[in-house]
Swiss-Prot record:
Superkingdom of source: Bacteria
Protein name: UDP-N-acetylmuramate--L-alanine ligase
Organism: Limosilactobacillus reuteri (strain DSM 20016)
Keyword Cytoplasm included in the entry's annotation: yes
HAMAP family: MurC
Length: 434
């Protein structure tokens, strides 16, 4: 295999970090640039020996292949320099499509549940067959001889339209990016376009009306808990240890499966994984064992215990994700107080869903709201965290200087949620607890 030098502009991005590790695993030279601020994707890159540089056009050298992160436009100094040098430049989705096309590929799309489902499917398949995978939490593994390539297919700005996978999982369709899509129908149309590029089959959540009438060229198998779903979970038992259920494909029982994960969404995600494994004629006993072995994903219901407090870290940044995360906390800790600390992610998203956020956060026993985390594209807006607080009974604002407000809660489950840098609040709280 020809060895190349890949230069990533924005290498610390979650997808970019995953792809960098895949190309590195395959023996290519990999380096890249990003902001100096530390991120959770950084340590694994450095541990793999991948160099991370500050942005500087002088980093670019003849012969490099440049991978342009989604957050960076053509007027970025490094991208301009790459054009001047006549270097080959690939967008992140183009680079992913290049990697997946020589394998049996499964692209996981959906407004919510993409990363968790991608991680679960990657874990299960990799334990049974050589598998490459790209997960949206910065984890990636490359294997030149892989039978399968599992990857996250993000609908934001229609990035997933670069992909033509063998199989697609569609977890749900939701209006999650008001800065790009006009409405739910607009998002649904993008999913249908993606579906038309799938080569073999689609596995879609049966309860989502947007997915029920997809006009595509391959079979669509629905998964869920209803009698008319192709892949079904029945006799679901949810306990503080996880969930157990009987899985069926139409009239055929596939077995009884246990997952040590929480919330109804985790049952659905595991059912989608089963569907892929079944279609690829895999041994269900092995799949059963690997589902039970899976322990979770970074920033998806990640738990830490300090003294009598359980801290949960979760990427939830949309009302339905927050509802699912609080529901999962209540399943695992039915007798404890649940305290939510939420960092709104982008002004446009808070403005679009402020009532939904209020409704979901009201499921916690107490809610604290931090200042809004802006983005590269928007750092101001006509909405504030206080507007959200006013809609939630008994909620309060909190920031880095007032984290000691949380110390009044004992034997509680404190859930930190957000897609920005909510970890900084969490770390401050951990220091105070210690």
């Amino acid at each position: 295999m020809e060895q190349n030098t890949y230069y990533f502009v924005g290498i610390k991005g979650t997808g970019m970090a995953s792809l960098a590790r895949i190309l590195h695993d395959k023996g290519h030279q990999v380096l890249g640039s990003d902001i100096e601020k530390e991120t959770f994707t950084q340590a694994p890159l450095l541990a793999a020996g991948i160099k991370i540089l500050p942005f500087d056009p002088a980093n670019l050298k003849p012969g490099m292949i440049v991978i342009q992160g989604n957050a960076f436009d053509d007027d970025h100094p490094e991208i301009k320099r790459a054009h001047e040098l006549g270097l080959k430049i690939l967008s992140y989705p183009e680079a992913v499509e290049n990697e997946v096309k020589n394998h049996t590929s499964i692209g996981i799309a959906g407004a919510h549940g993409k990363t968790s489902t991608t991680a679960l499917l990657s874990h299960v398949l990799a334990a049974v067959e050589p598998t490459s995978y790209l997960i949206g939490d910065g984890v990636g593994k490359g294997n030149a001889d892989a039978r399968f390539f599992v990857f996250e297919a993000d609908e934001y700005r229609d990035h997933f339209l670069a992909y033509h996978p063998d199989y697609a999982i569609m977890t749900n369709v939701d209006f999650d990016h008001p800065d790009y899509f006009n409405d739910l129908a607009d998002v649904r149309d993008s999913f249908e376009t993606y579906g038309k590029q799938v080569q073999r089959a689609i596995f879609a959540w049966g309860d989502d009306p947007s997915l029920r009438d997809l006009n595509v060229d391959v079979p669509v198998y629905y998964y869920g808990t209803n009698p008319d779903d192709d892949f079904r979970a029945e006799n679901i038992q949810r306990t503080p240890e996880g969930s157990t259920y009987d899985a069926y494909f139409r009239d055929q029982k596939l077995g009884t499966f246990t997952i040590h994960l929480y919330g109804e969404h985790s049952v659905l995600n595991s059912l989608a994984v089963l569907a892929v494994a079944y279609m690829e004629h895999m041994n269900m006993d092995e799949i059963q064992q690997e589902l039970a072995n899976f322990s979770g994903v970074k920033r998806r219901f990640s738990e830490t215990d300090i003294a009598d407090t359980t801290i949960i870290d979760d990427y939830a940044h949309h009302p339905s994700e927050i509802k699912a995360t609080i529901d999962a906390a209540r399943q695992k800790y039915p007798d404890r107080e649940v305290i939510a600390v939420f960092q709104p992610h982008t002004y446009s998203r808070l403005a679009a869903y402020i009532d939904g956020f209020a409704e979901s956060l009201s499921r916690a026993d107490k809610t604290f709201v931090t200042p809004i985390f802006g983005s590269i594209r928007e750092n101001a807006g006509n909405v504030s965290s206080a507007d959200l607080e006013q809609r939630i009974d008994g909620s309060e604002g909190i920031d880095m200087d007032t984290m000691d407000k949380l110390l009044q809660y004992h034997n509680a489950v404190v859930v930190f949620m957000g897609a920005g840098d909510v970890e900084k609040y969490e770390e401050k709280y951990k220091e105070l607890l210690k």
